[in-house]
Amino acid sequence: MKKIICLLLSIIFILSPVISFAIFEYEDSIPTWSNAIETFAKIQNKVELNLDSESAILMDENTGTILYTKNEHSKLRPASVTKVMTILLIMEALDRGEIKLEDKVPCSERARKMGGSQIWLAENEMLSVHEMLKAICVVSANDCCVAMSEFISGSEEAFVMKMNERAKELGMNDTLFKNCHGIDEDGHETSAYDIAIMSRELSKNHPKIHEYTTIWMDSLRDGKSELVNTNKLVRFYSGCTGLKTGSTSLALFNLSATAKRNDLSLIAVVMKGPTSGQRFNDATRLLDFGFANFSNSVVVKKEQVMEKIKIEKANIEEVEIITERDVNILCAKGDEKNIRTEIIYDENIKAPLEYREKIGIINCYLNDELVGATNLLVNQKVKSKNIMDFLNELIIFSYKLGR
């Protein structure tokens, strides 16, 4: 027995440096299925919706998948739908901590003189960022847009430069902004496709904006200024979460509408509708088509525990394995039963491992086609066995051997 113990101890001491300092490399990248704004070729444009608007698009918010199009790249005047980008930049400035909701924003002479829809700000009048956002989202206040642009960037011109830079970053290749509010100006144009892109960025990554865009009626200035939402779908369409209307004599009637039912969030954009009513009818047709024909399956949730596994040379019995991010799969209704998952672990997984270190991947398939994936991570730091761990095992082994 003593000889066996001495032999095992010698092996432990010889191998211990290797155990302590072993280094393993893992790939960070994973295959993605939802390349934003990628056409879902199997199901888009299968029906004719007979839309009255000149241009339109229906997009799944979660994946960016396009579900229906009509002249989606036609460059048209956006009118106040321009404000989707203005609102996006405001929300991003809030996220970065550059401004706060309670900050007071002054109205300049230029902002006061803005025409079109407004709340009639007086020069030097101060409203909070929260109040400005409410006025922009609910009644499309041009004066508040200019005041916010000056507050964030120093001038509307500088702010518009940021709008165009952000549009380029988002891949909005049909777009050129000339102002922050959407009043007609030669060359100020975009497309239904690009509006869907920026609407998705705003709605998906800044869901707090829905607290403003779903307001039907409210007030400012201690109740003296009544606000009624220009987007009638907020009141009359089940699940509507926003987003922005726009109209001028040249642009006619535009709308970017967002809605959510169950786990499916949709973006419907219509441009150059002949009348206000027809734009809302067209958006309703698009949304109805989407909700009737598609579903979004949450296959894997972020940080979901998939299983517990043993790790070679680990000082603990088992380790929880979690997912890195959500995996949502958009599919035609009835196809949910054809979704399956497959877990693949990296080769030679050994301790030590850092907390949330990647050790594998979970692939998600729809009709045997890879459509989604996320990394598998360890849910704790995993240390290598040390000499004391081996000694403890040795003692247990020796005890069992001697019985």
Question: Whereabouts are the PLM-identified features?
Answer:
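A generic local structural motif
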Residues: 9, 42-44, 254
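Hydrophobic core
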Residues: 9, 13-17
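Domain-terminus/edge residues, biased toward the C-terminal soluble/receptor-binding domains
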Residues: 172-176, 184-403
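Active-site-adjacent loops and short helices of periplasmic peptidoglycan-processing enzymes
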Residues: 21-206
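Positively charged n-region of N-terminal signal peptides that target proteins for export
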Residues: 1-4
